[in-house]
Amino acid sequence: MENTEASNLIGMAQLAQLKPTDLRGKTIFIRCDFNVPLRNTSKGLYRVADDTRIRRFLDLTFKKIHELTEGDCRIVIGSHLGRPHKKKDRSGWDGVFNIQFVCSHFDTLVRRVYGDTYTIFPPETLDSHMKDSLEIVAHKRLPPGGIKFLPNLRYLLDPKNTDLYRKEFITKLADIADVYINCAFS
């Protein structure tokens, strides 16, 4: 691939054309569509009720990335989940739309196929301090084979986050990612 800014935008149609050198050792930001239904368990936790979108991503995009890199890459995953809203007392976000529930299920599915090749790093926060979630990647602490889940991307819409904050987050994400793959419209 050409080493231009435009070459960092990889769509599904172009993924098949990539070579190992395009992705090996790189940090890949993947915008996924993991907006999946959740169900409440008897213990008050939530579980993925239908993992079709997650499995489709693993069977297509993730499989191709693994074939090209054999785990020698760093992956940052961003997705939204539902439409989170503030708690009635405005103390924080309703935890129902915590991407952690998706992250746990994703980890289970990845381990079944790839064993310990990949290490999943869940989001640290339920709230909208999303820039903090990029620190592990920005400071090169995400190891090869590391997959970092960002908090629910809809948290960026928190009214306390200014447009400047959102731009800073996007700029920081662009600085750490070598490649962008958009799978959010599958």
What do these predicted regions represent?
Residues 1-186:
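Active-site loop-to-helix "anion-binding N-cap" substructures in soluble metabolic enzymes
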